[in-house]
Amino acid sequence: MSTEAKAASAPVVAAARRTWVLPLVLTVPGLGFLSVRFFEATHEGIANARSNACRALSPDPVPAALLNREAPDFQLPDASGKMVSLSSQRGHPVLVNFWATWCPPCVEEVPSMEDLARRLEKTDIRMMAVSVDDSWDAVRQFFVKGTKMGVLLDLSKNVPKSFGTEKYPESFMIDASGHVRHYFINKRDWSKPEAIACLESLR
């Protein structure tokens, strides 16, 4: 190519390069914006799904005395005699369930509670199944094959009273900061996938 031809083609090449560079410059920030919006939309979608999961479990209104307040702390023995407190679970979502072996709806609820407990084993979510039976013998006879439910025994029956519980079963979902967020009167099917999704929203 002659010197004159090269000189003539130079503006064309430069213009072509500018044509490619301009969309690229405009596209990079655009991709960043789209990435942020995608993240926000995904995060919002997950939050909505978990909120819907909680509603699917049909929670009852949180008692006024507990609404937006820290759950009453308690310390009770497990089957080995070790004392376990609610406050020691801080930083984890917790499902507190008040029940008894002599309570028919509680007994009906236990299989789904067991199913949930097994699925929670490898998560940071805790379950505290507080029995108001009169002795460990009754609880041990009930769970002949053992249990994953994290059973504690309250011989005084004062802990349920501190939560305002008068009938069994009743359950409270407590968030990682120790506040009661959801309340359930009577039995629920805790084997539903919504149960874990709802608890996950309390991290």
Predicted features, each with a name:
Residues M1-E70:
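N-terminal targeting signals for export/organelle localization
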Residues A49-N52, M173-R203:
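Thiol-/selenol-based redox modules, centered on thioredoxin-like
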Residues A65-N68, D73-V94:
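A short beta-strand-turn-helix
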Residues R90, F98-D115:
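Conserved redox-active cysteine motifs that mediate thiol-disulfide chemistry
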Residues E114-R118, E200:
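A structural alpha-helix within SAM-dependent methyltransferase catalytic domains
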Residues M128-V130, R140-S177, I185:
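Short, internal strand/loop/helix patches
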